[in-house]
UniProtKB/Swiss-Prot annotation:
Gene Ontology cellular component list: extracellular region; host cell nucleus
This protein's name: Crinkler effector protein 16
Keywords: Glycoprotein, Host nucleus, Secreted, Signal, Virulence
The keyword Transmembrane helix belongs to this UniProt entry's keyword annotation: no
Sequence motif HVLVXXP motif, location on chain: 140-146
SUPFAM superfamilies, per the entry: P-loop containing nucleoside triphosphate hydrolases (SSF52540)
Location(s) in or outside the cell: Secreted; Host nucleus
Positions of region (DWL domain): 58-139
Domain of life: Eukaryota
Signal peptide range in chain numbering: 1-19
Organism: Phytophthora infestans
Length: 618
């Protein structure tokens, strides 16, 4: 029997390499006792027999050049001629061990069954594994502590910390950037994918949010935006950046509290006292997702830097935003179609539908790629039906209240921003969303909708709806008929503009009729509309009178196929009327092809009382 000096390393703990002297005839259980005795503080709450021990073998290369763990096979004659070697202390894997990190090879070494305590070291080392004799400048034994087994020195005297065993958070130190991606070995909790796409906006926002020109003072930042746009994933990106920079970070996550002390990832079981200024200091970044930092028990937010990610809601952001120093607010942008195309291969189940969902629901990955069980038009219709008109034009902001309809209406209303992401606009998810809002509200809230035509100043959402409201309103006026102010349109070359006149449009003999297309022989004095929204020629027609275009802008062109349709409308039918609001009636000019006789008809805004609630216009 020979006394050997074994260099041991605790997997996942920085600076944990230490030596143990023991007789090689002793049992493995005695080695465990010796390891615990050598590091009593590290193994304070774990019994020696619970430790898992693995041999630190030097890797060999397989046929592809990849490093793999050598396996001793006594039946192979060539293996009896040469002993397996120990892991050199300058090998890449050994250096990572000393830093408290791990890699694929360390994972491979510790993936097998640990040796039984009843075996002798001689049997374990030489008989079963044919190892060479231990010497200096080597790592010999890897020590793995089972879950809940670590008792690490607390970072503060009163906080309770333990080594992190969550595989996702444990890997952050070893995750590298590959192109525009972070590649993980475990699934991200939110996306259930192993890759995180680094949007250019992530980098810009993080650069500004984490920059603190006032050394020694706390820094506050708020990142907000449309639900489902990726704010929580952005928090993981910020966590990765701070860890790579070896900064102290405390993450408030749904999976628990995670603390990185600059070298090791820990789980926080109890926060240190708010009086512990060594722990709570401006260099500590607290990352908070969807919680009001001022209401988190035990968090002295005035002593540390805080980044809060939240949807635009007063209960999460309002009180925190009041605290000095004033938080920098950033607005996470919607995803472009190109960005979504980059991550779409990770969601093969959405391959056939994501582009249509993007057109309908806007640049929100959760709705476009992840939660795709509901038809997008049905999703928008449900939101329109569940919300009042006031709900549908309320301006979202960080001061917005939260009620039962908040989440629903955010399917319709999004927040758009551009670099440097400090300002935002409230917009609708899509043209389809606006069409459906007007269509569903026209029957019961017609007066309110019509009131927007002349009094929507100050509310960009209401202004966005005006074009679609005008189409519905103009169609009703057409169906009713009557006398309208009008003028013939001429090219810009004509110096004199003809005077206004009046024209009588006959009342439709029946309510507007839906037709597949314009056809010869359709009834005179009957208003027809196309049955599909993608009918591109004209918006409506009346045989022996003419075709109609609902127009809310000066640049409206004549659609392809209009001339052919007008030719089928019979006597006096080959003419095109542009129905225009007061804003554009005077300045509207003749469009190409100019061979078509064209007229502008003034459709005045209705004179109705504005019934919108004041809150929607604030």
């Amino acid at each position: 029997m020979v006394v050997v000096s074994l260099q041991c390393a605790i997997v996942g703990q920085a600076g944990s390499s230490f030596d143990v002297e023991i007789d090689d005839g002793a049992k493995v259980s005695k080695l465990k006792d010796a390891i615990k005795a050598k590091k009593p503080n590290d193994f304070k709450v774990v019994d020696a027999d619970k430790l898992h021990l693995f041999l630190a073998k030097q890797p060999v290369e397989d046929e592809s050049g990849k490093e793999v763990v050598p396996v001793y096979r006594p039946s192979a004659e060539e293996m009896k001629e040469e002993n397996l070697k120990w892991l050199p202390d300058e090998h890449r894997a050994a250096l990572k061990l000393v830093e408290g990190e791990s890699d694929d090879y360390i994972h491979a070494l510790t993936a097998g069954e640990p040796i039984l305590g009843s075996k002798t070291l001689t049997t374990w080392f030489y008989t079963k594994n044919n190892m060479e004799l231990p010497s200096s400048e080597q790592i010999h034994v890897l020590v793995v502590v089972p879950e809940q087994g670590f008792s690490v020195p607390t970072v503060s005297q009163d906080g309770v910390f333990d080594h992190c065993i969550n595989p996702f958070f444990l890997q952050f130190r070893t995750v590298d950037k590959v192109g525009d991606w972070l590649e993980f070995s475990s699934l991200l909790p939110l996306t259930r994918r192993q890759k995180l796409y680094i949007r250019s906006s992530y980098q810009v926002i993080a650069n500004h949010a984490l920059f603190n020109p006032n050394v020694g003072m706390v820094k506050y930042a708020v990142v907000t935006g449309t639900p489902g746009v990726g704010k929580s994933v952005f928090v993981y990106y910020v966590l990765w950046r701070l860890i790579k920079e070896k900064k102290r970070v405390l993450l408030f996550d749904n999976n628990g509290l995670f603390y990185f002390d600059g070298s090791t990832m820990l789980i926080c079981l109890a926060l240190p006292s708010k009086f512990n200024e060594q722990f709570w200091s401006p260099d500590l970044w607290c990352l908070v997702d969807s919680m009001d930092p001022t209401s988190i028990p035990g968090l002295p937010y005035r002593l540390c830097s805080v980044l809060l990610a939240s949807t635009p809601r007063r209960d999460c952001i309002g009180e925190f935003k009041k605290q000095p120093p004033t938080a920098d607010v950033f607005y996470m942008p919607l995803w472009s179609k190109e960005e979504l195309a980059t991550i779409a291969p990770m969601y093969p189940h959405a391959a056939a539908v994501w582009e249509n969902r993007f057109d309908c629901l806007g640049g929100v990955p959760r709705l476009v790629l992840q939660d795709i069980g509901t038809n997008p038009q049905a999703l928008l219709m449900s939101a329109c039906s569940s919300c009042s008109l006031d709900d549908c034009i309320v301006l979202a902001s960080i001061h917005s209240g939260v009620n039962s309809k908040t989440t629903i209406v955010q399917t319709l209303i999004h927040i758009r921003s551009q670099e440097p992401y400090r300002e935002y606009k409230v917009v609708y998810a899509s043209d389809l969303a606006m069409q459906l809002i007007v269509r569903t509200k026209w029957q019961h809230d017609r007066a309110k909708l019509q009131s927007l035509l002349g009094s929507s100043d100050g509310n960009p959402l209401a202004q966005s709806l005006c074009g679609y409201i005008f189409e519905f309103y103009s169609m009703d006026r057409l169906e009713q008929g009557g006398t309208f102010v009008y003028r013939e349109l001429f090219s810009k070359k004509r110096k004199r503009t003809p005077a206004d006149g009046t024209i009588d449009i006959p009342r439709s003999s029946q309510p507007r009729q839906v037709a597949e297309r314009v056809e010869v022989g359709q009834h005179a004095k009957q208003l027809y509309v196309p049955g599909t929204s993608n009918y591109t020629a004209i918006d409506a027609w009346m045989p022996q009178f003419g075709g109609f275009q609902m127009t809310v802008g000066k640049t409206h062109d004549i659609k392809g196929g209009a001339a052919d349709d007008l030719a089928k409308l019979g006597q006096n039918g080959n003419r095109l009327f542009f129905l225009l609001p007061p804003l554009y009636y005077k300045t509207f000019t003749k469009k190409t092809p100019q061979t078509i006789k064209q007229y502008a008809i003034l459709v005045p805004y209705p004179e109705v009382r504005n019934e919108l609630s004041a809150s929607t216009l604030q």
